[in-house]
Amino acid sequence: MAQVKSSSKSDPNYKVVAENRRARFDYAIESDVECGIILEGSEVKSLREGGANIAESYAAVEDGELWLVNSYIAPYKQAKTFQHEERRRRKLLISRKQLSDFWNATQRKGMTLVPLVLYFNHRGMAKIKIGVAKGKKLHDKRETAAKRDWSRQKSRLMKDHG
């Protein structure tokens, strides 16, 4: 299983389970919101072991509710008979105002809801950060990569010479 990493050194209870690093490269994130997620017991235990992937998933507003679609949570080995479905749709908990904001955002051309990080907060509750994003064109992706490479090169030069 994947290793669960602690995101903050000051708070050992804040644990990142899955991160969609590709989303920041493929999309321009306009805003993000923390949402609760409804899980079954075996899903929570599997998440605590680090068995999750949100890279191919997305969020959708359907019938006045927010759903996480195509996210993968590995089966929990000790839950033999009460096993959860690995790629089921999971309901996200969000306020009505944020839900209407998400609905309005997705109605604009090219906008989508992308999961960014799945983690346990300081109270031990599973949370997911959803971003309102617009897909980048190929030249935008190249520009982002060039800026990232230049900043790395600058930091190397400053470290070596300064």
Swiss-Prot record:
One of its GO terms (biological process) is trans-translation. One of its GO terms (cellular component) is cytosol. Coiled coil: none annotated. Gene3D superfamilies: 2.40.280.10. It is found in: Cytoplasm. Pfam families: SmpB (PF01668). The keyword Cytoplasm applies. Residues 140-162 are annotated as: Disordered. Its main location: cytoplasm. Keywords: Cytoplasm, RNA-binding. One of its GO terms (molecular function) is RNA binding. Required for rescue of stalled ribosomes mediated by trans-translation. Binds to transfer-messenger RNA (tmRNA), required for stable association of tmRNA with ribosomes. tmRNA and SmpB together mimic tRNA shape, replacing the anticodon stem-loop with SmpB. tmRNA is encoded by the ssrA gene; the 2 termini fold to resemble tRNA(Ala) and it encodes a 'tag peptide', a short internal open reading frame. During trans-translation Ala-aminoacylated tmRNA acts like a tRNA, entering the A-site of stalled ribosomes, displacing the stalled mRNA. Belongs to the SmpB family. This is SsrA-binding protein. It comes from Roseobacter denitrificans (strain ATCC 33942 / OCh 114). The lineage of its organism: Bacteria, Pseudomonadati, Pseudomonadota, Alphaproteobacteria, Rhodobacterales.
